[in-house]
Swiss-Prot record:
Protein name, entry field: UPF0297 protein LCA_0388
Alphabetized NCBIfam families for the sequence: PRK05473.1 (NF003997)
Similarity-based family: Belongs to the UPF0297 family.
HAMAP family: UPF0297 (MF_01507)
Domain of life the protein comes from: Bacteria
Pfam families in UniProt: IreB
């Protein structure tokens, strides 16, 4: 292995769909448990503390499969793709 070259890692084309599916599952789980889903997800994304996400429905394990920056990137892309650029 050549240590002089930077290796490029690509999350793949399925990653955004997986992030979306994960966020939908986590959101629904948080609602089911009586939490404010937006506040809890934002708390997790800002702090990295998985305690913001319940273990119920395997939501905590699902969201931790994605890097927080990957989730934020998907949220921003989705927001801008919806025409929210004004």
């Amino acid at each position: 292995m050549n240590l002089d070259k930077t290796v490029h890692f690509d999350f793949g084309k399925n990653s955004p769909k997986n992030v979306h599916e994960t966020l939908v599952t986590v959101y629904q789980t948080l609602e089911d448990k009586g939490y404010n889903p937006i506040n809890q997800i934002v708390g997790y994304l800002l702090s990295g503390d998985p305690a913001y996400i319940p273990r119920y429905n395997d939501a905590r394990n699902l969201i931790r499969k994605h890097e927080r920056d990957e989730i934020i990137e998907e949220l921003v892309k989705n927001y801008l793709d919806k025409g929210n650029t004004k």
